[in-house]
Amino acid sequence: MALQVQAALLPSALSVPKKGNLSAVVKEPGFLSVSQKAKKPSLVVRAVATPAAPVASPGAGTSKADGKKTLRQGVVVITGASSGLGLAAAKALAETGKWHVVMACRDFLKAATAAKAAGMAAGSYTVMHLDLASLDSVRQFVDNFRRSGMPLDALVCNAAIYRPTARQPTFTADGYEMSVGVNHLGHFLLARLMLDDLKKSDYPSRRLIILGSITGNTNTLAGNVPPKAGLGDLRGLAGGLRGQNGSAMIDGAESFDGAKAYKDSKICNMLTMQEFHRRFHEETGITFASLYPGCIATTGLFREHIPLFRLLFPPFQRFVTKGFVSEAESGKRLAQVVGDPSLTKSGVYWSWNKDSASFENQLSQEASDPEKARKLWDLSEKLVGLV
């Protein structure tokens, strides 16, 4: 496929209004438009200035404001939707016909290509640029989304970075350790800013979903595999996770461990969900939830693990632990938490056993500590510039 780029600027959004034609739309002076004609296998990218495409064919919902039927689809934003669980969930939700999916991704064209390759129907999704490793990018995404004119009915904080073999930290554009900066701080700012959009929604069941992980839940067998997650007294986070004249680890440890940094970030995700619930559920009626959709042993999240692990882990999960879950099945589970009318309970950490229905799982003592959640919230607000 030949690629011709006629504008050197960062892509912001791309929607697919009709079959066979890709058109990027964001209300800014220079956006990218991607068009593809059926007869020629070429992709053309050009600068345009057009209003955002409207949300596709309607579904029915009850307006909270006036009790009337809202003849539109729900709109869900999913971070990290260009591959793995995020893409599978985007596809599952789009296929219901009840949701328009905004794929919030760092690699704009990768996401557009992935959606097309997955067979997502034209008009069922919009691709928008979001780099969670940059707080400025998070703010720009929120601004672009609001300029699009779309409502927000559900937000899924799914994207994650996992660098299990790293012994030296890398850092975000704002100078924070990468795993916590992307997995927690970037999502924290995104969720805080877009809470206002969720509050304005007239959709009958508004939801904010933050992905958890069994690896950050130390009351499980998997959660006790070294290195174990643990935030300590958050002294490293309080110091800014800079790594220079301080620690890049949340607990303040001197040595860096990429696997533990990821697990710690997942504790942060689960604590953040619960603090959202305590602060805003009663006031707003928004459902706040987390989940562990199962062990997706073939996910690209493991791409930086050692080759032997990538070779042996999938069959081990499939035939020994019996915990293997395909990306397609995990995507359906995430889609269920987003849209199933029976899963409206807030403050819940959802899980599944093999071939079982969803159930409310118990979090470890640390991952459900309200005092630690409040301290994490306050420190995170300072680090992302909200106070």
Swiss-Prot record:
InterPro entries recorded: NAD(P)-bd_dom_sf, Prochl_reduct, SDR_fam
Keyword Plastid appears in the UniProt entry: yes
EC number(s) per entry: 1.3.1.33
Major site of localization recorded for this protein: plastid
Transit peptide, from-to: 1-35
Pathway terms, separated by semicolons: Porphyrin-containing compound metabolism; chlorophyll biosynthesis
A molecular-function term among this protein's GO annotations: protochlorophyllide reductase activity
GO cellular component: chloroplast
Swiss-Prot/TrEMBL keywords: Chlorophyll biosynthesis, Chloroplast, NADP, Oxidoreductase, Photosynthesis, Plastid, Transit peptide
GO biological process entries: chlorophyll biosynthetic process; photosynthesis
Catalytic activity: chlorophyllide a + NADP(+) = protochlorophyllide a + NADPH + H(+)
Localisation: Plastid, Chloroplast
Summary of the function given for this chain in its UniProt record: Phototransformation of protochlorophyllide (Pchlide) to chlorophyllide (Chlide).
Family listed: Belongs to the short-chain dehydrogenases/reductases (SDR) family. POR subfamily.
Protein name, per record: Protochlorophyllide reductase A, chloroplastic
Taxonomic source organism: Oryza sativa subsp. japonica
